[in-house]
Amino acid sequence: MSLVAIGINHKTATVDLREKVAFSPDKIHDAMKSLAKCTKTGEAVIISTCNRTELYTNTGDEAEVIRWFEEYHQLSHEEVEPCLYKFEGQGVVKHLMRVSSGLDSLILGEPQILGQVKQSFAKAREAGSVAITMDRLFQNTFSVAKKVRTETEIGAAAVSVAFAAVSMAKHIFSSISSTKVLLIGAGETIELVARHLKDNGVDSMVVANRTLSRAEGMCDEFGATAITLEQIPDFLPKADIVISSTASPLPILGKGMVEKALKQRRHQPMLLVDIAVPRDIEAEVADLDDAFLYTVDDLQSIIEQNMASRREAAEQAEVIAENESHLFMEWVRSLESVDSIREYRTQSMAIKDELVERAINKLAQGGDSEQLLLELANKLTNKLIHAPTQALTAASRQGDLNSIGQLRSALGLDKN
């Protein structure tokens, strides 16, 4: 058997096609069982996220895996084939290690994908579609992803606006977990900011939004307080950090409002991060002594520097993935050799048992023991040397000196 993987991701397919080939969480368990039945080893793992759908199997039949994929999603070969990428053997191992380490992600080095791969593997275990090879492959991959995180700086620098905003706050405040944060807006970016803040131990968050119900929905997840935009002046004086991202055409925070809040704070410093376009916070706020205002342009320059750092770290990570994939394939080959040795020994023992049984029967019938012993030795020798003799003859006819040399070495003909 050999490892085979096929997939579609953000680089090869449109959102429309990615949606069509995605596996819903409630159906992926049965899908893995179904795919596993198509393989001779019964091993299959499916990874399905918003940016990729990938099938990992331990089978030698790539065409069968592709056929199953197309039939499951009721798509034609013409729709799928142009967007499909395929890997075999070591290519599968290296690709999975790259994916799990964030080297193949939309945002280079993003850590979320490792958790998604782990969830997929756990579901495959539940479905019973994992055996020795897939188990070893994924466990090794998780170790490699951890190694990439600890031995390179691929995850150290912020490369998203939301992450960069929180990273900046961490640099300014010695203990971000004890700060009070006001978030303005309730869109995807602010939700991501809230998640990063929560991960860094921030418990005191207020979310201000034009639509209160939208803010309340987000606050339920993060244990925050929801308010309307009109209530901002009441909550602003309590905020150590303000991060804003709305679609408002006009500024939400003016210099006067911030100045008044700073007076009430007795001029304790306030960090304001405006990641909206157009701006949510008037530029003049930066003129206030105790206000530290950063815009999306400031963050973008940080992100560009950090992305360069990540690309450098990614080169180191690629070397790790390459080396580790080689080591895994050595284990696979050793597994194959163990199976071959076991099969060869079983076959040889069966030949021996058959010939010995015949000799015993003839001996019981009064046969000459010396003659039977000689006959047994000759027949056993002929049976055991038959396959190597055929291999040597075939290699000789083809002029395959390399195979002849290997066979001579294996048979011990070159000793002494």
UniProtKB/Swiss-Prot annotation:
Active site per database record: C50 (nucleophile)
Binding site for NADP(+): G185, A186, G187, E188, T189, I190
Binding locations of substrate: T49, C50, N51, R52, S105, E110, P111, Q112, Q116
Top-level taxonomic group: Bacteria
Keyword Metal-binding among UniProt keywords: no
Annotated site residues (Important for activity) in this chain: H95
Keywords (A to Z) from UniProt: NADP, Oxidoreductase, Porphyrin biosynthesis
Pathway: Porphyrin-containing compound metabolism; protoporphyrin-IX biosynthesis; 5-aminolevulinate from L-glutamyl-tRNA(Glu): step 1/2
EC number(s) recorded for this UniProt protein: 1.2.1.70
SUPFAM superfamilies the UniProt entry points to: Glutamyl tRNA-reductase catalytic, N-terminal domain, Glutamyl tRNA-reductase dimerization domain, NAD(P)-binding Rossmann-fold domains
Entry-linked Pfam families: GlutR_dimer, GlutR_N, Shikimate_DH
InterPro entries xref list: 4pyrrol_synth_GluRdtase, 4pyrrol_synth_GluRdtase_dimer, 4pyrrol_synth_GluRdtase_N, GluRdtase_CS, GluRdtase_dimer_dom_sf, GluRdtase_N_sf, NAD(P)-bd_dom_sf, Shikm_DH/Glu-tRNA_Rdtase
GO biological process, one term: protoporphyrinogen IX biosynthetic process from glutamate
Keyword flag NADP: yes
UniProt GO molecular function: glutamyl-tRNA reductase activity; NADP binding
Catalytic activity: (S)-4-amino-5-oxopentanoate + tRNA(Glu) + NADP(+) = L-glutamyl-tRNA(Glu) + NADPH + H(+)
Known function: Catalyzes the NADPH-dependent reduction of glutamyl-tRNA(Glu) to glutamate 1-semialdehyde (GSA).
Note in the entry: During catalysis, the active site Cys acts as a nucleophile attacking the alpha-carbonyl group of tRNA-bound glutamate with the formation of a thioester intermediate between enzyme and glutamate, and the concomitant release of tRNA(Glu). The thioester intermediate is finally reduced by direct hydride transfer from NADPH, to form the product GSA.
HAMAP family in UniProt: Glu_tRNA_reductase
Family stated for the protein in its record: Belongs to the glutamyl-tRNA reductase family.
Subunit structure: Homodimer.
Domain notes: Possesses an unusual extended V-shaped dimeric structure with each monomer consisting of three distinct domains arranged along a curved 'spinal' alpha-helix. The N-terminal catalytic domain specifically recognizes the glutamate moiety of the substrate. The second domain is the NADPH-binding domain, and the third C-terminal domain is responsible for dimerization.
Protein name according to UniProt: Glutamyl-tRNA reductase
